[in-house]
C-alpha cells in the first residue's frame, strides 16, 4: 500500500518537473519572439525619424494599407517596443518563479528516492 502511494507521488513529481521544464522552454521562445519584435520596432522607429515629414506613410493592416502621419507611426513603434519589453520582463519573472518551483520539485523527488532506499 505504501509502495503504491510512493510510486504515485513519484509519478506526480516527475510530471510536475517535466511540465515546468517545458513551460520554461516555452517562455524562452516567447522571450526571443518579443525581443525580435522589440528590435524591429526600434529599428523601424529609428529609420522613420530620419525620413522627411512630407512623405506619405502607409501601414499595412491585413490586406489593406492605412495612410498615417509620421508622429503617429513613431509613437506606434515606441508603444510596440515598450509592450515587448514589458512582456520580456514578465516572462523573466515567470521564469524565476518556475525555476524555484522546479528546484523544489527536484528536491522533493530526490528525498522521495532517498526515503525509498
Curated annotation (Swiss-Prot):
<comment type="subunit">
    <text>Heterohexamer of two PFD-alpha type and four PFD-beta type subunits.</text>
</comment>
<comment type="similarity">
    <text>Belongs to the prefoldin subunit beta family.</text>
</comment>
<protein>
    <recommendedName>
        <fullName>Probable prefoldin subunit 1</fullName>
    </recommendedName>
</protein>
<dbReference type="GO" id="GO:0005737">
    <property type="term" value="C:cytoplasm"/>
</dbReference>
<comment type="function">
    <text>Binds specifically to cytosolic chaperonin (c-CPN) and transfers target proteins to it. Binds to nascent polypeptide chain and promotes folding in an environment in which there are many competing pathways for nonnative proteins. Has a role in gonadogenesis.</text>
</comment>
<dbReference type="Pfam" id="PF01920">
    <property type="entry name" value="Prefoldin_2"/>
</dbReference>
<keyword id="KW-0143">Chaperone</keyword>
<dbReference type="GO" id="GO:0008406">
    <property type="term" value="P:gonad development"/>
</dbReference>
<dbReference type="GO" id="GO:0016272">
    <property type="term" value="C:prefoldin complex"/>
</dbReference>
<keyword id="KW-0963">Cytoplasm</keyword>
<dbReference type="InterPro" id="IPR009053">
    <property type="entry name" value="Prefoldin"/>
</dbReference>
<dbReference type="InterPro" id="IPR002777">
    <property type="entry name" value="PFD_beta-like"/>
</dbReference>
<dbReference type="GO" id="GO:0006457">
    <property type="term" value="P:protein folding"/>
</dbReference>
<dbReference type="GO" id="GO:0051082">
    <property type="term" value="F:unfolded protein binding"/>
</dbReference>
<dbReference type="GO" id="GO:0044183">
    <property type="term" value="F:protein folding chaperone"/>
</dbReference>
Amino acid at each position: 500500500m505504501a509502495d503504491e502511494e510512493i510510486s504515485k507521488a513519484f509519478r506526480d513529481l516527475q510530471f510536475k518537473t517535466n511540465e515546468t521544464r517545458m513551460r520554461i522552454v516555452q517562455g524562452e521562445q516567447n522571450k526571443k519572439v518579443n525581443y525580435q519584435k522589440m528590435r524591429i520596432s526600434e529599428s523601424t522607429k529609428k529609420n522613420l525619424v530620419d525620413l522627411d515629414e512630407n512623405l506619405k506613410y502607409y501601414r499595412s493592416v491585413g490586406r489593406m494599407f492605412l495612410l498615417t502621419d509620421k508622429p503617429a507611426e513613431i509613437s506606434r513603434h515606441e508603444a510596440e517596443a515598450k509592450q515587448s519589453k514589458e512582456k520580456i520582463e514578465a516572462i523573466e519573472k515567470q521564469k524565476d518563479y518556475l525555476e524555484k518551483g522546479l528546484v523544489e520539485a527536484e528536491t522533493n523527488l530526490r528525498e522521495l528516492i532517498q526515503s525509498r532506499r
